Structure formats: structure tokens, C-alpha cells
Amino acid sequence: HRICELSPQGHIVMIDPHGEYASAFKTTGALYDVSNLQMPYWLMNFEEHCEVFLTTQGSDRQVDADILAKCILLAKGKNRLAQEFGKLTVDAPIPYLLSDLTQILQLEMGKMDKATDTAPYLRLRSKIDEIKADPRYQFMFSGMLVGDTMADFIGRIFRMPSNGKPISIIDVSGVPSEITSVVVAVLSRMVFDFAIWSRGEAKRPVLLVCEEAHRYVPKDESSGGQAVRKILERIAKEGRKYGVSLGLITQRPSDLAEGVLSQCG
């Protein structure tokens, strides 16, 4: 509340894992949950796509990842926005249709000579179809979201204009646990990118607050999602250069990654 009073033009994004903060910030906060978050799946970078769509480990995972990268590039290439990029990369935030992706997987699978070579394509298509059919994933994988732009999403989440509500509370309690870390990774990356892009504008500090931070940057590097760990570590190290502050809330500080903990004041 004090930060809101001191910096009404600032932006605060709070990741709320249990839906506990909405009542505390009724007058100053805008609440987003699975009913209205509407976070387009195509905002994911490739690493985040892999965490959602890949189901294998070891050498099979690399095979699946290579196929997924090729097919996502082809799907994004169908969007007229792709022509504006000199060289299209798999990380480019360009909308694409999931139906195009599954169709391309099917076409590429048809080029295989042996039945055993089709296994990676079948795995990927099966996982994508499973996600599309699961209503819990609709907030992110709805076909309606392909018409959104990154500017639309950032404008909504960062409350521009803030209209007296500088806090965005992102309630992720309804997000399937398998993709919670990816959702937090995308939101955190949007926070960092927003700060970098708006450097030339009037100073608008951004505070990203993560409740239960040990989930996202655990001391054990093998647990938790790697994408969310990377972006939060980067914000902790570099965020202050761009006006981004990171607030980590945890009852288990000993379980936090030491690199992030050392950056905390």
C-alpha cells in the first residue's frame, strides 16, 4: 500500500499462488485469474514451449525438441507478421494457430520412411491435442487468443493507463500445476521486456512480487522449471538497471537459490 502511495505511476505485478491477496487490494488492484487472464500461448519462447509440449527425457527429448522447433517456425511463418522479421526465429512472439502446428506435424510425419520415425510426431501431436481438449488450459490455449497482440496483453497486465489501480494480482491457484512455472516464466519475462522497451519513457518503476518464491528459484537446480528460474535470476541480477525490482516472499529462505538470495537486500 505504501509503494502505491509513493509511486502511483509505477506498476506492481504480484504472483499469488493461493488467491490470498485479492481482498487486501480491492481498491488498488486489478485481479486476474484463469477466468480473465487470457495469456496467449504464442507468447511462450521455445524453452517454455518445450516445458509444456515435451513429455520425454534424454536423447528422445532432443529429437522431439528439434521437430517441435521446425514445426513452430513453419506455423509462425504462415502469419503475415513473419514477413516483417528479417530472420524469423522460433522465439519470435508471433501468433500462430495450434491447428496449423498439428497439421504441419502431420505433414512432416507423412515424409517419414519408417513407422518407428513417426513416434516423436505422434507424441507431440498427442500432447497438443490433450492440452486443447482440457478446459483447465483454456485461459492460455484458447483459439480466440491468436487474434491478440503482445501490446494488448502487456497493456492489460501492466494497467496502462492504471486508472488508480497500479497493482495487478495474478492468481495462479487455478492454473494446472504442470504449467504454473511456465505461466510465471512468461509473466516475468513480460515484466523484464516491458522495462527494457520503455527505458526512454518517463520513469515507471516495476515491482514483480513472487509469493512462495522457493517454487520458482529452488536451491536444487534439478527441481522446478528451468525457464522461470533463468528469468527470475536475470531480473535479480540485472533488473535494477532497467527499473525492475524483484520481491521474493517465502517461508523457506534456505530453499532459495543462493545466487538469487545474494542479490536480495
Give short role names for the model-derived ranges.
Residues G19-R234:
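P-loop NTPase motor domains
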Residues A22-T28, P253-G265:
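Short regulatory helix/loop adjacent to the ATP-binding pocket of P-loop NTPases
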Residues H11-D16, L31, L248-I249:
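Short, hydrophobic beta-strand segments that form beta-sheet elements in well-ordered domains
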Residues A227-G247, D255-Q263:
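Transmitter module of two-component histidine kinases
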Residues V172, I249-P253:
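Glycine- and other small-residue-rich loops at beta-strand/loop junctions that grip anionic moieties
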Residues D16-P17, E211, V244, Q251-R252:
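Conserved H-loop
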Residues R2-V13, F194:
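Post-Walker A helix-loop "phosphate-sensing" segment adjacent to the P-loop in P-loop NTPases
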Residues S7-Q9, S162-K165, E201-R204, R240-G243, ...:
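Short loop/turn elements that form and flank the Walker-type P-loop nucleotide-binding site
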